[in-house]
Amino acid sequence: MESALTARDRVGVQDFVLLENYTSEAAFIENLRKRFKENLIYTYIGSVLVSVNPYKELEIYSKQHMERYRGVSFYEVSPHIYAIADNSYRSLRTERKDQCILISGESGAGKTEASKKILQYYAVTCPVSDQVETVKDRLLQSNPVLEAFGNAKTLRNDNSSRFGKYMDVQFDYKGAPVGGHILNYLLEKSRVVHQNHGERNFHIFYQLLEGGEEDLLRRLGLDKNAQNYQYLIKGQCARVSSINDKNDWKVVRRALSIINFNDDDIEELLSIVASVLHLGNVQFATDEHGHAQVTTENQIKYLARLLSVDSTVLRESLIHKKIIAKGEELNSPLNLEQAAYARDALAKAIYGRTFSWLVSKINKSLAYKGTDMHKLGSASVIGLLDIYGFEVFQHNSFEQFCINFCNEKLQQLFIELTLKSEQDEYESEGIAWEPVQYFNNKIICDLVEEKFKGIISILDEECLRPGEATDMTFLEKLEDTVKNHPHFVTHKLGDQKTRKVLGRDEFRLLHYAGEVNYSVAGFLDKNNDLLFRNLKEVMCDSGNPIAHQCFNRSELTDKKRPETAATQFKNSLSKLMEILMSKQPSYVRCIKPNDAKQPARFDEVLIRHQVKYLGLIENVRVRRAGFAYRRKYEIFLQRYKSLCPDTWPNWDGRAMDGVAVLVKSLGYKPEEYKMGRTKIFIRFPKTLFATEDALEVRKHSIATFLQARWRGYHQRQKFLHMKHSAVEIQSWWRGTIGRRKAAKRKWAVDVVRRFIKGFIYRNQPRCTENEYFLDYIRYSFLMTLYRNQPKSVLDKSWPVPPPSLREASELLREMCMNNMVWKYCRRINPEWKQQLEQKVVASEIFKDKKDNYPQSVPRLFINTRLGNDEINTKILQQLESQTLTYAVPVVKYDRKGYKPRRRQLLLTQNAAYLVEEAKMKQRIDYANLTGISVSSLSDNLFVLHVKCEDNKQKGDAILQSDHVIETLTKVAITAEKINNININQGSIKFTVGPGKEGIIDFTAGSELLIAKAKNGHLSVVAPRLNSR
């Protein structure tokens, strides 16, 4: 830990005890802020761990981190929850004394996560066997089950524990976890029937609806919509973006299986959960006598089936109250309000008792199953207390009263045990104990729990007394009994300023953590936790095994009045205190950095409030009352011995004597330190800081000295090693080179001899003398052929073969060509085949004849240039009996004036059509198509020559197409006029009408120009693209 002091200005100190101004709340919070900013969420107060919830995942919980803290002294590594867990475990193993880890803090501070991390640490680092592995799994998997049934979303926390939990983890003599046991405290049953705005009911309800299989929900009579259930819509917050109920359901189902729930147990448990939802949907109406009547029979049927009770008896029990007077049983009808109260009371009782049964069932699964129980010994337990923190809301009720009383008791225990551990350490080290002044909250605990005069006793008395007892009569009795107590105030007892903020139905307690106003509304009902007798009778007769176990028939015959909720809680709290007092405690204080649950946000006001009510400044004061720093002599000497010439580099005597020499050399004043039996105690942090800063300076000079010596030694060793290696390598390499040369020379002579002989006999039949040469020639030719074989059908190259392989070469050449042709043909599909056929036709007609033909070669011919949506529907109707094979937009020039007009050229099986929008302008039967003329230049003009035997027949068609090569190829193929396409140079004659002709003149120019010439001809100027 001391090594981190050099960065204390940036990241703060790792132990609040080392703060110079340790009584300053501002200095405390500033140190928290520095560390939180650097994602250092853990800080010590002596042996107490302060944890700030980061609201994000940090990379500090891996197996590597666990190993780093495993078996390491508490102060040798940075603060961490694993350090607390490991310290407790090592104390358990070495001192054989039971341990407990007390985790406290307000809702959302990270208590549940802290307890999970501790369990995960033990699961990974403790010894393993098959049985131990099963126990580890069950310990870990008990968490999601308890969270599902006992946690809920509140305004401050999406996974708030609504019950207190104390878990004992049992270890055997080898240090392996072999069992566990859970105690639960004060489940918030009122949440089952009511939630504040923005809050939810317990997670299990939403998980069941969201993740339950269709078949399961059908058996339970449920549907997936949470809005259909009265107990789930009070908070208007059924869905939460940060909670995935469907995935959580899968985790819970798997966890139930691991902790030994069979399918029947799960089905019975979920039947009870479903019954609570159905119970919330039971509605009442008043009859003419003002008595309540059930109006939702379907819900009663579902309830009766799920709980295996008689539906008639259940219905009557919800609207009647059984009264036993003078040995006679009377059924008194309930009004609307009383029936609703009875329904909600039953729902709370069912859920609360089921939760207790669930904890009991988990305990059976966690119980140690071994036969060698005696081997566990007395020091075999580590307890984890994860309990609600101090709560202060705008509206505080009975639950907050109990929770805050619990925190008062824990604070009292915390101060007592902390002071005791400090005093014990001082006494064991032979240092005088200096009394510490601190606030003793015993006065507040007595105010709540004192017999006859305490608030709980008064509350019980008011619940039990005959007559009309109300919440206000309870408050009046409080005012009469404890009116003079300095930590108790009501509206009636307060001054004028207090009356402005304190309601008439409220009382205020001045807790150690601050003032809290409690509303007495509901105190008597919640304390009585009353369930009508006839409803108990119904549940005792339930055929559901879990419900039957939860409602024992002995309750009906027991004349003794059951303990009230507050008394039960007080008694269970007293037992918890006894458990904790019997163990060696460790503490984790959890702090919530902001209410918005956002990472990297530090709300100073909220944190100051938590620092105050957790008593952290008080804790620092107690720890600093004597000495801020203490370490064993061996550790202190080992760290700082370099600061004194007499102790550096080694001290041969006792560590205590070495430390005495060291502190004298450092100039410590007598009032700054004390020497104990095994430890040195330093009173002021500044003394330790000065020592640490001196060590940091000394490290540089030591490092320089060591570097110089090490570099010299290292380089010398390196040189000697290299020299030796060089000699060895040279010797070995020279021998190797010599042997290789001799072998290579021998091989070369043999090769040359065989090659010469082969060359001499090369033209003779194969024999011993020429076989090597012929094999080489054959191999050489084949390898040359392999590297230079043709890549395509068009490649006619072929290596020249030697005389002996000419025949084989020709055979190979023919096989290679056939193979390439076969491969090429195999890859051609029908569409590509058609494309090639059209390209072949185009080549036959235009290659080396028309200038713009080369530009068309790499472009694929399109099936049609016009879609059906671009051709007028009337035209398509006229062509209905004919198949349209090709369509292209063209420009048609008049035969007389040469005026250009936009047309569509449509080709069918029998004729070509010139179309203007919806009008058919000219039909040219292929039988009347005598020829097609086109120039040799790069223009796109062509003429379709048509027979013209009378005046009714139109003459030739002069057309222009942007895709002239494609268009003419399509026309030639469709009309079967491949040999009738004339490519002209200079001019083209065309027929205007019977006996009349026109001329189109073509000349080469720089750019395309089509216009009527002065001589009446159509003049076309087109650039030349190649010389052909």
Curated annotation (Swiss-Prot):
S-S bonds: none
Residues reported to bind ATP: 53, 61, 104-113, 157-161
GO cellular component, one term: microvillus
Annotated compartments: Cytoplasm; Cell membrane; Cell projection, Ruffle membrane; Cytoplasmic vesicle
GO MF, one annotated term: ATP binding
Sequence ranges assigned to domain Myosin motor in this UniProt record: 12-696
Tissue: Expressed in brain and the sacculus of the internal ear.
Sites of N-acetylmethionine modification: 1
Region annotated Actin-binding, chain positions: 573-595
UniProt keyword list: Acetylation, Actin-binding, ATP-binding, Cell membrane, Cell projection, Cytoplasm, Cytoplasmic vesicle, Membrane, Methylation, Motor protein, Myosin, Nucleotide-binding, Repeat
Primary location: cytoplasm
Domain of life of the organism encoding this protein: Eukaryota
Post-translational modification N6-methyllysine, affected residues: 348
InterPro entries membership: IQ_motif_EF-hand-BS, Kinesin_motor_dom_sf, Myosin_head_motor_dom-like, Myosin_TH1, MYSc_Myo1, P-loop_NTPase
SUPFAM superfamilies: P-loop containing nucleoside triphosphate hydrolases
Keyword Aminoacyl-tRNA synthetase: no
UniProt-listed GO biological process terms: actin filament organization; actin filament-based movement; endocytosis
Pfam families per record: IQ, Myosin_head, Myosin_TH1
Domain TH1: 850-1024
Membrane topology category: Peripheral membrane protein
Domain IQ: 699-728, 722-751
Entry function: Myosins are actin-based motor molecules with ATPase activity. Unconventional myosins serve in intracellular movements. Their highly divergent tails are presumed to bind to membranous compartments, which would be moved relative to actin filaments.
Subunit structure: Interacts (via its IQ motifs) with calmodulin.
Protein family per UniProt: Belongs to the TRAFAC class myosin-kinesin ATPase superfamily. Myosin family.
PANTHER family per record: MYOSIN, UNCONVENTIONAL MYOSIN-IC
Name of this protein: Unconventional myosin-Ic
Organism from which the protein derives: Aquarana catesbeiana (American bullfrog)
Gene name, Swiss-Prot/TrEMBL: Myo1c
